[in-house]
Amino acid sequence: LTKIKYSVKATPIKGRLKEASIVPYHNVFGLILVLDDGKAMPEKKDISRICAIDMGINNFAAITNNIGVPSLLFKGGIIKSINQYCNKRMRKIRSVQTAGTTNKFKMTDKAHKVCLKRNNQIADFMSKIANKIVNWCVQNNIDTIVIGKNTGWKTETNLGKVNNQN
């Protein structure tokens, strides 16, 4: 194993370290630190200002509320586009590797890079949307966010005539 040193003094960490874990992610490793800042959790107040989030495919999230503020709608086309482009590139890599042979496809460095890029783009999109939702809730003093249970989600989705892209 390689010895890696990380200077915690250089980072603005405030609080007591409770847990540290290393998580593999594609060809890299992530360091997750859990800190205790010593602050008590805020007490629950009267729940009166509620927003509801409806997750979807064409519309990634539709957000409404009970206080009369205009609703939010986040389109999901960007995620569909990212997935479509990733599937196209993976299909090409798979085709080149398995052309003229009976060997099964094995993940290569190039395939890992394509998947990593896709996952990073999706994570970036999700992070930005979550940040916008939280900021909107704070701005409008929303105290409760409700996200429905999505049992059987996407079962009635029309994925098209040909669906052979994993």
Segments from the language model and where they lie:
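Acidic carboxylate diad motif detector
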Residues: 1-23
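Positively charged, helix-rich recognition surfaces that bind polyanionic ligands
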Residues: 25-166
